[in-house]
Amino acid sequence: MLPRRRLLKALAAAGLLGPAGISGLIRDALAKGDAPIRPGLHKVRGEVIVNRRLATEGQLIKPGDTIVTGANSEAIYVIGQDAFMQRELTTVNFGGEALQNLMRVVSGKILSVFGKGARTIQVSTATIGIRGTGCYIEEENHGAKARTYFCLCYGDVELTPSAAPKEAERYSTTHHDKPMYIHNDMKMPKMMVPADVINHTDDELTLLEALVGRRPPSWGSGSRY
């Protein structure tokens, strides 16, 4: 079971501890320990839209759904073995029945943790094949000016830039070891360039993994992020 103090710290960092005390989401996570909580939307802040309709906490997210967050908004949700923290001004689409392992990040920023099994993430600049990972994505601009920030926080990935498929890389990380920017600009000497760790934390990853009954690989090692 996750130590109460560390889990509460992660939940507070994600803005889930309010003046009313422990929310239903937090009670479920603490009470079940390593057991996953029910699927669906577990935090709705601001304007969150699912399939062109305003979303509510507890709502189920299904294959084929599109989730959109407005300004100063955020959504935390669970789909099967996977959990997501979708930040403001972000649009994400999940593949339908025949493409349940496909996720499209159309715009914005999202932190995700995935269970065992292969998944494919499509972004404006690349196709990202993952397995049992935590990752953070930010999408910027469109067309030739598009740029994607990608941090494989831990796990395995096969990353293929759309503008230069021959530069595809397959690698593994354990703790934010290889963040990068992926470009669409053919004038650049390389489409993938090193980056820093930005805009996501180990506490947020701890929260998401707790919601699906897991722990990040770096758990208890003295987080730097």
State where each predicted segment sits:
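Flexible, surface-exposed loop/linker segments and immediately adjacent secondary-structure boundaries
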Residues: 7, 11-15, 22-63, 70, ...
